[in-house]
Regions:
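Membrane-embedded segments
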Residues: 76-190
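Residue-level recognition of beta-strand->loop/alpha-helix junctions
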Residues: 129-131, 316, 352-354
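Catalytic His-Asp segment of secreted/periplasmic serine-dependent ester chemistry enzymes
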Residues: 331-396
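N-terminal secretory targeting modules
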Residues: 1-82, 97
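Secreted/periplasmic serine-hydrolase-like ester/acetyl group-modifying domain
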Residues: 32-36, 175-308
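The substrate-binding groove and active-site-proximal loops of carbohydrate-active enzymes
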Residues: 282-292, 326, 367-374
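A structural motif corresponding to the C-terminal end of an alpha-helix
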Residues: 117-123, 297-313, 341-351
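Short, solvent-exposed loop/turn segments at secondary-structure junctions
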Residues: 93, 320-326
Length: 396
């Protein structure tokens, strides 16, 4: 018996030591450094303005708390003074151009700068950035359905970014599944599934994933309780794990495991770029299931906005002239035809900013010119253009 206990203690000690060693050494940071050019990596700005009153600050990872906070503040704002802008990471990232240097002050992206200009001009509008990296139009539809079951969140204007890459994205990310905690929203999504539209399967998969996660959590809770007939006692393994996690969470090294995961993902991306030659600048075409599903999502977005009195505004996102995303001229023509048709059918406004940012203002990062992200001056330029052209109706 003593020998068995000693083995258990020794196994736990060795496991803890191995975990501690990995966290302390952080092997993926060292592997990542093999591929990184420090001068280029510094171009990615980490100090950005964060304002939960105007931004979904989790960038799609945990939006429920953000939207509940927005709802409480927007209930005192009339619908015609509310607008939401949605898009990919271009809307919340700054990648410095070669001529730009880091600054101590937090940088602002074009949605922030646009809102500042509007209110400085007396527009008296309340804007909100509802964006996520690599967002799909299925996710934009997912968000819109949530907004529509909360009257205080319904915007008077919905500003949607067109981006060539977005038409290639699919699915609803795990972080957005928590919106299904809202029974009214869950009911609406179930109705969308029954529509048999091309995006319906994506929504069904999201529901299945959410229900599987909830069932697993409930199963873990149930399995942690030992029902002996005398009393319900917590299982020893569960108690030990809980106490160990609580103790470890007090250690700064263990709390940094989220950063370690991010470094692992960065390493995998850099390995893909450097070893396989697959980069964001790799030219691609549109087609197949992703295009069909995204188109059907945008059609549904247009229909819902029209039905609910929401003014839809589309804008074609800037592209880097030094790193075009189109594989052929036919790809560009196809894309232009798609967005023009959608804008004519559903848009109360359409603005084309594809060629609005000159090459020298774009970011350069790790593997060369970035096709989507740009620097500080470019964000100011785009915000000025959006203001001057009246993208937000409050400006007019």
């Amino acid at each position: 018996m003593k020998h068995s206990k000693l083995q258990t203690v020794l196994a736990l000690a060795l496991t803890f030591a191995a975990l501690w060693g990995l966290l302390a050494w952080d092997p993926f940071r060292h592997l990542r450094d093999i591929f990184v050019n420090p001068a280029l990596e510094n171009a990615k700005v980490s100090s950005l303005l964060t304002d939960p009153n105007t931004q979904e600050v989790s960038d799609g990872q945990k939006p429920l708390e953000s939207l509940r906070k927005l709802e409480s503040s927007w209930c005192n704002v009339s619908k015609d003074r509310r607008y939401i802008l949605t898009g990919n990471s271009q809307t919340f990232s700054v990648l410095l151009a070669p001529s730009e240097a880091p600054q101590a002050e937090a940088d602002r992206t074009y949605p922030d700068l646009l809102l500042d200009r509007l209110n400085a001009a007396g527009a008296n509008v309340h804007g909100y950035r509802l964006s996520a990296p690599n967002i799909s139009y299925m996710e934009v539809l997912w968000y819109l359905n949530y907004l529509l079951v909360h009257p205080c969140l319904i915007p008077g204007e919905f500003v949607i970014q067109f981006n060539f890459e977005t038409f290639r994205k699919t699915g609803v990310r795990e972080g957005m599944l928590e919106l299904l905690e809202d029974p009214d929203f869950a009911s609406i999504i179930e109705q969308e599934v029954r529509s048999n539209a091309p995006y319906a399967n994506t929504f069904q998969q999201a529901i299945d994933q959410y229900e599987s996660r909830i069932a697993k959590e409930k199963g873990n809770q149930a399995s942690s309780i030992s029902k002996t007939g005398f009393a319900e006692a917590r299982g020893a393994g569960n108690v030990l794990e809980t106490k160990a996690r609580t103790a470890l969470d007090h250690l700064s090294l263990f709390r940094s495991r989220g950063e370690w995961k991010a470094e692992l993902l960065d390493f995998l991306y850099l390995a893909r770029v450097n070893l396989l030659g697959i980069t964001p600048t790799t030219k691609r075409s549109l087609g197949g299931g992703p295009l069909t599903t995204n188109l059907s999502s945008l059609e549904r977005i247009g229909e819902l906005c029209r039905r609910n009195g929401i003014r839809v505004v589309f804008f074609n996102a800037p592209q880097n002239p030094n790193a075009p995303l189109y594989r052929t001229s036919a790809d560009r023509e196809q894309y232009q035809q798609i967005i023009s048709r959608l804008a004519r059918k559903f848009g109360q406004g359409y603005f084309d900013f594809e060629n609005s940012i000159p090459g020298p203002l774009w970011g350069v990062w790790i593997d060369g010119p970035d096709p989507i992200h740009f620097g500080r001056a470019a964000h100011r330029r785009l915000a000025d253009l959006m203001f001057e052209q009246g993208v937000i109706s409050g400006k007019k």
